[in-house]
């Protein structure tokens, strides 16, 4: 399981960014937005491979931004909190676990994919031209607690 998680969550994003980055570097501009996680900043419980892959994502974002910012690329990330998707269905369907998670989220609700529209558009736009190596959390306030 460890290898599969690292392959999907870290290696695939690195390989894709390397390939896309080649063209962007030739053109002298581009924006890469990585998918991080709350576990980019926290250790998590029972998910060491996932936590390690997302912790490494933070370092990858910073390393690539250090290399490519001066060449016209912006490298940033989005860190989703607890979002109502297929991946979180079991958590949402467990009343006790869901209550404990929602109690920690200041907005008191699960996020939705629509919650990413603004942050992703911002990072993809010229409004973020001076941002590099940053990760925006979209978590209903989870990390503020």
List each model region and its residues.
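Active-site helix of classical SDR
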Residues: 17, 53
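Substrate-binding pocket helix/loop in short-chain dehydrogenase/reductase
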Residues: 1-6, 101
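Active-site loop-to-helix junction immediately N-terminal to the catalytic Tyr of the SDR YXXXK motif
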Residues: 42-51, 63
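A conserved structural motif in NAD(P)-dependent oxidoreductases
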Residues: 105-116, 127
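Short, small/polar-rich loop/turn modules that mediate ligand/substrate recognition or access, typified
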Residues: 69, 74, 131-133
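Short C-terminal tail/terminal secondary-structure segment
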Residues: 42, 120-121, 132-145
């Amino acid at each position: 399981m460890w290898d599969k998680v690292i392959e999907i969550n870290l290696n695939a994003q690195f390989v894709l960014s390397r390939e896309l980055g080649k063209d962007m570097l030739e053109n002298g501009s581009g924006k890469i937005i990585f998918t991080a996680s709350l576990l980019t900043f926290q250790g998590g419980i029972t998910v060491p491979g996932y936590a390690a892959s997302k912790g490494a994502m933070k370092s990858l974002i910073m390393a690539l931004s250090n290399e490519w910012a001066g060449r016209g690329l912006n490298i940033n990330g989005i860190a989703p909190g607890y979002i109502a998707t297929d991946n979180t269905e079991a958590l949402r369907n467990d009343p006790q676990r869901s209550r404990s998670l929602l109690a920690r989220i200041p907005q008191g609700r699960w996020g939705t994919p629509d919650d990413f529209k603004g942050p992703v558009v911002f990072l993809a736009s010229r409004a973020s031209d001076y941002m590099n190596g940053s990760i925006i959390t979209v978590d209903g306030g989870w990390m503020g607690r």
